[in-house]
């Protein structure tokens, strides 16, 4: 058998390429990287395949938030057709240096719900990403509404108990919100998804790493057998 490397490609899924090192990240108490975040958001996109839901990859959300050229940003945003979306899922990272790939120390989640014309920020660590979330909100808002969308911090967001599970909380929260929406959440527009997140996420994060790892191994096995 040949030698293996952490950089070995193990799976191509949609537009995401996972490497062997990503399995180690999921196995251990380690901060989730962009690839793992993008992979699971892409998987959720296939599960919740409605054209009115858009789960934005971390790299795209980061670029939108930090693009210095407003005219270029307008051209960049056109193919995303965000005005046609009822639910928009945006990962937030506190990296402010566009020259540093996969920088940053914390993940959180920004959600836009068209029915309420509201952006909601879910932060699992005492709201430390508030500034980054508001920056992303200001950048995206003109492309989903007439600039009159509101911004809300969800203070009931379940909180992490360590320094490395923020990405897991992001993904768990995104999953619960997508499930809420797909199960007819629009009918409960006054309550939104807050109760679902508060009740479901704390348990979900306890086994989500293992669940994602099992999913990757299943997809790897299926790709080999094709």
Swiss-Prot record:
GO biological process: one example: proteolysis
Keyword line: Hydrolase, Protease, Thiol protease, Ubl conjugation pathway
E.C. code: 3.4.22.-
InterPro entries reported in the protein's UniProt record: Nep1/2-like, Papain-like_cys_pep_sf, Peptidase_C48_C
One Gene Ontology term of the molecular function aspect: cysteine-type peptidase activity
UniProt superkingdom: Eukaryota
Family, as annotated: Belongs to the peptidase C48 family.
Matching PANTHER family: SENTRIN-SPECIFIC PROTEASE 8 (PTHR46468:SF1)
Main function: Processes the pre-form of the ubiquitin-like protein NEDD8/RUB1. Has the capacity to discriminate between NEDD8/RUB1 and ubiquitin. Has no SUMO protease activity.
Protein name per the record: NEDD8-specific protease 1
